Design a protein with these regions (language model features):
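Active-site-adjacent beta->alpha loops and helix N-cap segments on the catalytic face
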Residues: 45-60, 106-120, 135-138, 160-172
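Glycine/small-residue-rich loop that forms an oxyanion/phosphate-binding "nest" at active or ligand-binding sites
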Residues: 67-111, 303-352
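Rossmann-like adenosine-cofactor binding region
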Residues: 395-464
Length: 464
């Protein structure tokens, strides 16, 4: 049945709902949106056979639909409490109802090899491996799967560190004669969901538009197609991204991928969730993909310097980098935050001898403080960590302040906010709870576009 794999669409919408009518409603909604490959998680239903009847009903009205039937047992992180024999009987019924393919976990397949061979005579069989704890060595897992003939092998792990993505995607180069589906669950493993098909995998999974997916890290097919241009870039595409923790708030993927599309570039820009202690590990992934360059934001702008081969003089002086790229095999870093602060402020304020309050003591605050001092401003620095704010003020020739010393009578020409306070999803947080001590407010937080600080500044008729 392996020849049928060629006709499988490249995005499978995972439908796991506990009500058969909701299952059908979401299935029809996806079909109206142009998706044609749906996974019916029969094990989510109180009666999986209701799902089998739903398959027949849907295919009667939508014969163009391709359905993958899954009925994962409870012992293997599914919801079906029956025996392996009952599980395979349900999947056999799904095939009779018109399902084009079935997914059987390796634990069941190993205990029913004869039945698996029989099922494969009538349908496309995917044998799957899931690891919810981490990402083990992948080659032994593939060898285990390969002992049972199938039309596709699915290997799904959980990414605990960035390089786990590389371990998973590297298997696409294994030379397997049987097509593979390779994914790493969780936000850290997001890149596998976008890149795996371009690397030669059979398909990837996406969540339905108006319901939760069936695995951590799934996103909607519309995001895959429209935001990440999933079906537009090739195996040779250049990979870029943003490195941060958190990273879900970032609008950088939307900005850069639209720019790539406008310029018809074979490239993709991804969000990389990298914890502070995982920066070194990220470079293992970056070198393997390979990543061509990336934006750097909270909390890595300072620590990343130690992993770069070359840093330009301004960024070295500031002690923070926000842009990294590879040239001649070497990682190079620069800082564009400095001019991003000075240029817009200069349009509204004569910076020499102006009084500017920089709020923060991290990489973005360092960039702003150094640039403003260089422009001739009198810079004061206040932060959540008074010791770090004091240290920053010392190295950039600024003046340290304590938050409690800033009152309603304190007034600056401009305030530059450089902390993550107010950033999605913690939108109710703000550094100043009851005042805006400046005539002009520059908030580096861009998601949401209007933070609590900006709202208060507008209420007080401050310039934004």
């Amino acid at each position: 049945m392996g020849s049928r794999n060629a006709s499988l669409p490249r995005i499978c919408i995972a439908l796991g709902l506990g009500d058969v009518q909701k299952l059908l409603a979401h299935a029809r909604q996806e079909l109206l949106a142009g998706e044609t490959f749906l996974e019916f998680r029969l094990d989510y239903l109180p009666s999986p056979l209701d799902g089998v009847r739903a398959i027949a009903e849907l295919l009667a009205s939508h014969p163009e639909c391709t359905i993958l039937a899954t009925c994962r047992r409870h012992q293997n992180h599914g919801r079906f409490n029956g025996s392996i024999e009952e599980q395979l009987r349900i999947l056999d019924a799904a095939v009779d109802a018109g399902a084009h393919a079935i997914d059987v976990e390796i634990e069941s397949a190993e205990n029913a090899k004869t039945r698996m061979a029989e099922l494969r005579q009538n349908t496309t069989v995917i044998i799957s491996y899931h690891n919810y704890d981490g990402t083990p060595a992948m080659e032994p897992v593939l060898r285990r799967l390969a002992k049972i003939p199938a039309d596709g092998y699915k290997l799904v792990t959980t990414a605990r560190k960035p390089s786990d993505n590389e371990k998973v995607l590297a298997l696409s180069k294994s030379g397997s004669k049987t097509p593979l589906i390779l994914l790493a669950m969780g936000e850290i493993g997001f890149s596998t969901r976008v890149l795996s098909v371009a690397q030669g995998c059979l398909y990837t999974y996406a969540s339905p538009h108006a319901a939760e997916g069936t695995a951590a890290g799934q996103i909607g097919a519309r995001h895959l197609r429209n935001l990440y241009r999933f079906d537009k870039f090739t195996k040779a595409a250049k990979v870029f991204g943003v490195v941060a923790d958190p990273v879900r708030h970032s609008i950088s993927p939307a900005v850069h991928n639209r720019a790539f599309q406008a310029r018809r570039l074979d490239a993709v820009y991804l969000p990389f969730l990298v914890a502070p202690q995982q920066l070194k590990d990220f470079f293992a992934l970056a070198n393997a993909l390979p990543v061509q360059g990336f934006s750097v934001t909270i909390p890595h702008k300072q620590k990343i310097l130690r992993y770069l081969d070359h840093v330009d003089p301004l960024a070295r002086r500031i002690g923070a980098v926000n842009t990294v790229w590879k040239k001649a095999g070497k990682w190079r870093g620069t800082n564009t935050d400095a001019q991003a602060v000075v240029k817009p402020l200069s349009k509204h304020l004569r910076l020499p001898k102006s009084k500017v309050l920089v709020v923060g003591n991290g990489g973005a605050a360092r960039s702003a403080a150094f640039a403003l001092v260089d422009a001739g401003a009198q810079v004061s620095i206040v932060g959540r960590n008074p010791d770090r704010a004091r240290a920053l003020a010392k190295v950039c020739d600024g003046t340290p302040l304590l938050r409690e010393h800033i009152t309603r009578d304190t007034r600056f020409d401009a305030l530059v906010h450089c902390t993550p306070l107010g950033m999605w999803p913690r939108v109710d947080e703000t550094f100043f709870t009851d005042l805006v001590p400046a005539d002009i407010v520059f908030d580096m937080v861009y998601n949401p576009l209007e933070t609590l600080l900006v709202q208060r500044a507008k209420d007080l008729k401050r310039q934004i």
